[in-house]
Swiss-Prot record:
Residues annotated as the enzyme's active site: 67 (proton acceptor)
Organism annotation: Levilactobacillus brevis (strain ATCC 367 / BCRC 12310 / CIP 105137 / JCM 1170 / LMG 11437 / NCIMB 947 / NCTC 947)
CDD domains reported in the protein's UniProt record: RNaseZ_ZiPD-like_MBL-fold
Source taxon at top rank: Bacteria
Subunit structure as annotated in this protein's UniProt entry: Homodimer.
Protein name according to UniProt: Ribonuclease Z
HAMAP family for this protein: RNase_Z_BN (MF_01818)
EC numbers, comma separated: 3.1.26.11
Gene Ontology MF term list: 3'-tRNA processing endoribonuclease activity; zinc ion binding
Sites where the protein binds Zn(2+) 1: 63, 65, 141, 212
PANTHER family assigned: ZINC PHOSPHODIESTERASE ELAC PROTEIN 1 (PTHR46018:SF2)
Catalysed reaction, written as an equation: Endonucleolytic cleavage of RNA, removing extra 3' nucleotides from tRNA precursor, generating 3' termini of tRNAs. A 3'-hydroxy group is left at the tRNA terminus and a 5'-phosphoryl group is left at the trailer molecule
Cofactor or coenzyme needed: Zn(2+)
Length: 317
């Protein structure tokens, strides 16, 4: 699981930062990529990465401001031109379907795949499969806006081979059955429950990706105990009143949220073009005074979301 930032700027494209788009690479977990927001020129940014549009099977839109959606029609079109034929699902506020369908109809664009739409009206679970759950919560922005919480389901515990050997259970295909937690009958008649030979379940990872927002209790629900929190930082320390008036957040507010909600790593994006070079470094320095594990990300930064294994005693290894 990796996060790749395709655009980390705010408002409009700049020399050093494109507008917002974030890729969650789940190639090992489900051989797919999920995008969060698709600002203008996102497909150009993708050309500078190893991402393949046909691998994108879900797009989560936080809100309908142009710097978060203007790249969507072009990306959908290019995915089709490049041979993508698998269905794609778009999640987002009411209106996202109309935006996409009108854009494609007016430009007479025909896609080689089906788009499914899930327009969000309430908070809660929006997707679940055998490996992941995704939750959405309303945020506090000038227009309807959502944040997303991606929860990986727990992994089965590791097979305790030493215990199996001590119990004189011979190795072979039976180990695979026991690893799956199945109950098996051995040739000598013994009935073995696989669950008795598994270590503690390994907790899945949690990533929270927020859209534009002022401080709100719903952000806490999304962020709590996250391995990684992606949070906007449109304004700097000392600009909280300005941030509130524009329905945005400061770097300090994001850091305070991360600290309060026991987040492991905070990644700040949606950086205004006002902050370049030393000023961007100062944004990071200010936030780290509150929450040390903070990073101001740049376009094309890749962040691995580590998988923390538990020992037999249930403590981090």
């Amino acid at each position: 699981m990796e996060i790749e930032f395709l655009g980390t700027g705010a408002g409009s494209p700049g020399k050093f930062r494109n507008v917002t788009s974030t890729a969650l690479r789940l190639l090992d977990e489900r051989n797919s990529v999920w995008l969060f927001d698709v600002g203008e020129a996102t497909q150009h940014q993708i050309l500078r990465t190893t991402l393949k549009p046909r691998k994108i099977d879900k797009i989560f839109i936080t809100h309908l401001h142009g710097d978060h959606i203007f790249g969507l029609p072009g990306l959908l079109s290019s995915r089709s031109f490049q041979g993508g034929d698998a269905p794609l699902t778009i999640y987002g506020p009411k209106g996202i379907r109309n935006f996409v369908e009108v854009s494609l109809r007016v430009s007479e664009t025909k896609l080689s795949y089906k788009i499914r739409y899930q327009e969000l009206t309430t908070d809660g679970l929006v997707f679940e499969d055998g490996k992941f759950r995704v939750y959405a919560q309303h945020l506090d922005h000038r227009i309807e806006c959502f944040g997303y919480r991606i929860e990986e389901k727990d992994h089965p515990g590791e097979l305790q081979v030493e215990q199996l050997q001590a119990a004189k259970i011979p190795s072979g295909p039976v180990y695979g059955q026991l690893k799956a937690g199945k109950t098996v009958t051995l040739p000598d008649g013994r009935v073995i429950n696989g669950a008795d030979f598994l270590g503690p379940a390994q907790p899945g990872r949690i990533v929270a990706i927020l859209g534009d927002t002022r401080q709100t209790p719903n952000a806490e629900k999304l962020a709590i105990n996250a391995d990684v929190l992606v949070h906007e930082s449109t304004f700097a320390k000392g600009e909280s009143k300005l941030a509130r008036s524009y329905y945005h957040s400061t770097n300090i507010q994001a850091a305070e949220l991360a600290k309060r909600m026991h987040v492991k790593q905070l990644l700040l994006n949606h950086i205004s073009a006002r902050y370049t070079g030393k000023m961007a470094a100062e944004l990071q320095h200010q936030a780290r005074e509150v929450f040390k594990q903070t990073r101001v990300v740049k376009d094309f930064d890749e962040i691995e979301v580590p998988f923390e294994k538990l020992t037999k005693e249930g403590t981090p290894s």
